[in-house]
């Protein structure tokens, strides 16, 4: 596609999102409309490129399948409305097999670094700024041949001085959820045979009041500003000829400004790459028993006591009788020790037993609960970005690999209670200043209900863009009372029929936040959500979260509609609390770090009540977050509790429409992991229930408990 025009240079993040292939954009100054197209750039490569490719392939298969299922159902339309066809849901050449079933073949795609994007002017649809006459060029070559002739026309009735037209590229196009766009021009000639029209705009500013008027002298004919999508028209007319009933509104395109966000939605996803491929093995459908066992270990399910005789027999059976002799000797010595020393020795004995279990010398004595077994089996159909089991395993790996407080002057993981000199606030080299800082930090963390706060200097994260949609970012859109399928389009091929996937491999600063489990449980109880079985000693909240989880669905459809009737559960409420806290954190730190809200990303681990907020970008990390902490530290966290941060500029209007809007805690689509759903300020401060909630009683805010 590069031969169609020059290339544009922007940041890698911009090229992979705002300027990704298929987008219509204008340069600075607002003149002209251009279509971005893919070019062959540097192939993505890293020391873990094989693992990254594997994770992208796994995610894409699920994304394609979920999109297909949601689009073919169209929120129940498939059962009662006009039929839906696979070609309306997924681009055939990229995501469908010969049976028109969802398919993702990694060999048809190429992973690229977004270093350049091509572009050319399109659509070449011009309007006279004086009389409103329209003129359309078919392509760049047609424009090159004929634009001088058009510019020299002298038939403008509203330019009496020279009768010349004042041509400018029209900034409105027709768009359709099939992924197509067309110039704003009548679909057919006038009934008198004339092919030229005036665009008549209304004073109301509404597109619905615009229309086309025949330019021929004396012809009174006008046309509504409508156009049928060529792709959908060809598909449905063929079905109509065979007797299938369809409605004209399925084909009608929408007039949209090319500057409007609804014209183009780039489709992206993200993940934390794990060089250790054991995560893929453990999550494989054939490893369900091993996966269940790992969950029992992570969330501290209580083990049945094992007798000394059982330990002795097990160790002797694997030729480790000597290990038991040492164990028995230590246990006998414990009797004569003082309580403190005996406690330390008992911990050593417990560690020995756990080590033998990990080596396979001693079988674990935990019976897998039926609820865990059922969830491990059911998770194959869960949306991966909300799957608490997958995210729990990821969090466990993160704990082992990245959340370890390392040594050295430049620690990669920083405990902000004891930060190194380059992150520590000024003066904390003095003991009394450091103690005052720690006291203030401990106090505000308690008021926020935060148990753990770390800073990661280099969070390894991969974000990639793989296609786009128009009109809606999700698989369905409601237009004129009918739910329509939105077609997921891939980017056009760059070579040998390979389509680009743009990969952004980032290593930027981030904050890791984990909420206080006891406070969250208390908050759930205050909102009439008690955990059905009390947690045994040491058992973690994540155990009950996983056992009670019901799939949110890949697009959170149940939580979008104003007419939804969803019961509150410990899962959707805990997720909403965690998600809202992450947004509150981003909104606050964006003011102090010098980074805009769209420069951040979020990653949630709901079963572990933890989230990561990271700087999203491919430019060198200038240490904005560490500098922010050094300069403002506790003040940033205090702002999260301030009245201003817990209110909205929209006032009660926002409060009574779910407690989340762009004026308060909603974030750009590229930042939010859940499309700004399951989000409400009410979970932080007392407020009205979310629109999706069956229970319409007010929500008790988390901060009303943590600050009490």
Briefly describe each language-model feature range:
Residues 1-167, 172, 350, 382, ...:
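N-terminal alpha-helical interaction blocks
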Residues 1-62, 193-576, 588, 606-608, ...:
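Charged, low-complexity interaction segments
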Residues 122-125, 166-170, 208, 507, ...:
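Conserved structured core elements
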């Amino acid at each position: 596609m590069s031969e169609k025009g020059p290339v544009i240079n922007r940041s890698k993040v911009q090229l992979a999102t705002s300027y990704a292939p298929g987008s219509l954009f204008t340069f600075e100054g607002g003149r002209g409309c251009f279509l971005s197209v893919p070019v062959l750039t540097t192939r993505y490569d890293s020391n873990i490129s094989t693992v990254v490719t594997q994770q992208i392939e796994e995610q894409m298969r699920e994304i394609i399948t979920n999109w297909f299922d949601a689009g073919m159902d169209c929120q129940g339309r498939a059962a009662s409305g006009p039929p839906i066809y696979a070609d309306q849901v997924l681009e055939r050449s990229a995501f469908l097999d010969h049976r028109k079933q969802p398919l993702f073949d990694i060999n048809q795609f190429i992973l690229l670094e977004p270093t350049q994007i091509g572009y050319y002017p399109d659509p070449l649809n011009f309007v006279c700024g004086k009389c409103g006459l329209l003129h359309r060029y078919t392509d760049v070559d047609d424009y090159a041949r004929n634009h001088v002739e058009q510019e020299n026309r002298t038939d403008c009735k509203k330019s009496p001085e020279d009768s010349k037209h004042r041509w400018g590229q029209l900034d409105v196009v027709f768009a359709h959820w099939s992924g197509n766009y067309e110039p704003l021009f009548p679909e057919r000639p006038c009934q008198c045979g004339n092919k030229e029209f005036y665009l008549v705009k209304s004073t109301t500013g509404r597109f619905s009041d615009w229309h086309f008027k025949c330019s021929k002298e004396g012809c009174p004919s006008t046309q509504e500003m409508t156009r049928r999508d060529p792709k959908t028209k060809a598909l449905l007319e063929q079905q109509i000829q065979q007797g299938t009933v369809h409605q004209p509104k399925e084909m009608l395109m929408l007039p949209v400004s090319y500057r409007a966000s609804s014209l183009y939605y780039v489709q992206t996803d993200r993940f934390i790459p794990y060089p250790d491929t054991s995560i893929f093995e453990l999550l494989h459908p054939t490893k369900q028993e091993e996966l269940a066992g790992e969950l029992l270990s992570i969330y501290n399910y209580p083990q049945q006591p094992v007798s000394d005789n059982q330990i002795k027999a097990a160790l002797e059976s694997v030729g480790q009788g000597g290990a038991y002799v040492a164990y028995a000797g230590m246990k006998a010595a414990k009797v004569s020790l003082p309580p403190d020393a005996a406690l330390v020795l008992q911990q050593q004995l417990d560690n020995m037993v756990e080590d033998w279990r990990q080596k396979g010398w001693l079988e674990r004595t935990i019976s897998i609960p039926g609820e865990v077994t059922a969830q491990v089996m059911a998770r194959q159909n869960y949306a991966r970005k909300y799957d608490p089991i997958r995210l729990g395993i990821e969090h466990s790996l993160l704990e082992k690999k990245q959340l370890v407080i390392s040594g050295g002057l430049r620690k990669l993981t920083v405990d902000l209670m004891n930060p190194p000199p380059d992150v520590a606030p000024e003066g904390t080299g003095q003991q009394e200043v450091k103690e005052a800082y720690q006291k203030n930090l401990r106090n505000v963390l308690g008021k926020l209900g935060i148990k753990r706060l770390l800073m990661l200097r280099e969070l390894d994260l991969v974000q990639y863009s793989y296609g786009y949609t128009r009109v809606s970012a999700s698989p369905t859109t409601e237009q004129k009372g009918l739910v329509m399928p939105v077609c997921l389009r891939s980017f056009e091929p760059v070579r040998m029929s390979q389509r680009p996937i743009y990969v952004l491999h980032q290593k930027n600063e981030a904050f890791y936040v984990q909420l206080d489990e006891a406070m969250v449980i208390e908050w759930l109880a205050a909102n009439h959500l008690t955990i059905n079985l009390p947690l045994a000693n040491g058992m973690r909240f994540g155990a009950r979260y996983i056992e009670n989880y019901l799939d949110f669905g890949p697009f959170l459809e149940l939580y979008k509609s104003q007419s939804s009737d969803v019961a509150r559960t410990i899962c959707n409420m805990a997720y909403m609390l965690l998600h809202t806290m992450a947004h509150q954190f981003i909104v606050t730190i964006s003011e102090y770090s010098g980074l805009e809200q769209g420069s951040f990303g979020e990653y949630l681990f709901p079963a572990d009540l933890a989230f990561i907020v990271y700087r999203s970008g491919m430019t060198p990390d200038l240490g904005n977050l560490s500098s922010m902490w050094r300069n403002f530290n506790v003040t940033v966290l205090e702002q999260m509790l301030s009245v201003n941060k817990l209110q909205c500029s929209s006032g009660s209007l926002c409060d009574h429409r779910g407690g989340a809007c762009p004026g308060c805690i909603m974030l750009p689509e590229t930042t939010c992991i859940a499309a700004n759903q399951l989000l409400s300020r009410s979970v932080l401060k007392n407020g009205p229930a979310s629109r999706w909630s069956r229970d319409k009683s007010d929500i008790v805010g988390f901060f009303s408990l943590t600050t009490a």
